[in-house]
Amino acid sequence: MQLYTYFFTFSLVLILALADQENKSLDFTQEGGIAKRGAFQFSYLIKKYTGRNPLDYWGYGCWCGLGGKGTPVDGVDWCCYHHDMCFNSITQGPRPTCSKNAPYHKNYYFSGLKCSTGWLTSKCGRAICACDIAAVKCFMRNHFNNKYQNYKKNIC
């Protein structure tokens, strides 16, 4: 399963990089619509509401991107920390809301910065959506500091 997660993450990064390189839109979904994969929805929300390329957050500080350790370096990094902890809370424990890999492929509905509570959205989808929306709102409140991009994780 870990290999699947790395492969999917690499594929997502490659797709986003190619879309940015060719100045194509990252709008994988329409507002209020549904994307092919949950990770695309998170990327869409980041782009739409922060104006930044989602890849800007990849490797930012100690917690953004794959894995995470140490103390977050600033507000944006704290957003990533809380996003990771949010996913942990819905995928771990005696009765998890979602399977371990669901946050990377489970679809959800949203409108603006609100998750849909309609019958088409599962309990897991709503939980993932809530984690993603909270992270995007956090990104919007915090200053993105370029010096923490591609941060050396070994000093975390």
Curated annotation (Swiss-Prot):
Active site: 83, 132
Catalytic reactions on record: a 1,2-diacyl-sn-glycero-3-phosphocholine + H2O = a 1-acyl-sn-glycero-3-phosphocholine + a fatty acid + H(+)
Listed EC numbers: 3.1.1.4
Keyword Hydrolase included in the entry's annotation: yes
One biological process term in Gene Ontology: arachidonate secretion
PROSITE patterns in the cross-refs: PA2_ASP, PA2_HIS
Disulfide linkage: 62-156, 64-80, 79-138, 86-131, 115-129
Domain of life: Eukaryota
UniProt key word Secreted: yes
Cofactor: how bound: Binds 1 Ca(2+) ion per subunit.
Any GO CC annotation of this UniProt entry: extracellular region
Signal peptide: 1-19
InterPro entries per UniProt: PLipase_A2, PLipase_A2_Asp_AS, PLipase_A2_dom, PLipase_A2_dom_sf, PLipase_A2_His_AS
UniProt-recorded Gene Ontology molecular function terms: calcium ion binding; calcium-dependent phospholipase A2 activity; phospholipid binding; toxin activity
Function in brief: Sea anemone phospholipase A2 (PLA2) that may have a role both in defense and in digestion, since its expression and enzymatic activity were found both in the acontia (defensive organs) and tentacles. PLA2 catalyzes the calcium-dependent hydrolysis of the 2-acyl groups in 3-sn-phosphoglycerides.
Protein name (Swiss-Prot/TrEMBL): Phospholipase A2 A2-hormotoxin-Apt1a
Species per Swiss-Prot/TrEMBL record: Adamsia palliata (Cloak anemone)
Taxonomic classification: Eukaryota, Metazoa, Cnidaria, Anthozoa, Hexacorallia
